[in-house]
């Protein structure tokens, strides 16, 4: 494991969050995918494991296509300098489709990032139960008037 200072990890997370926020606003996930090393590994408990930046890029672009308005606000963050890790809980959040001031539709996710240095991440793992939580949340959002921007392009590899 690589040791990184807290300041370096905080800066890396700031860059990661900015790239993710840009992708959420524009639908272009390339800037976010470029934050991973060429040999990065992304472990996604419902969709499977993706090895390499280009496989991560292809997956994230397809999986996020139906949800251009989804955001990922963080509830808490922990920095592990000894292991170069950043852990956080975020919400997978869709805005209320009929009432801008209404409650969002969301479910929690724990993420573990491993920082490789030089502004790149070697690993990300998302821990949640999308087969249960995502289905319920998206169904409720659609029932409230939400519309998918595209059809689903990726099937879950693991289900309840």
Predicted segments with their positions:
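Short, low-complexity N-terminal intrinsically disordered segments enriched in polar/charged residues
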Residues: 1-34, 38, 155-160
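A beta-strand edge to alpha-helix "cap/lid" segment located at domain peripheries
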Residues: 2-7, 61-160
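A structural signal for well-ordered alpha-helical scaffolds and beta->alpha junctions
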Residues: 13, 53-56, 106
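General structural signal for alpha-helix termini and helix-helix connectors
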Residues: 22, 42-45, 97
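A solvent-exposed, acidic/Ser-Thr-rich amphipathic alpha-helical stretch
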Residues: 29-84
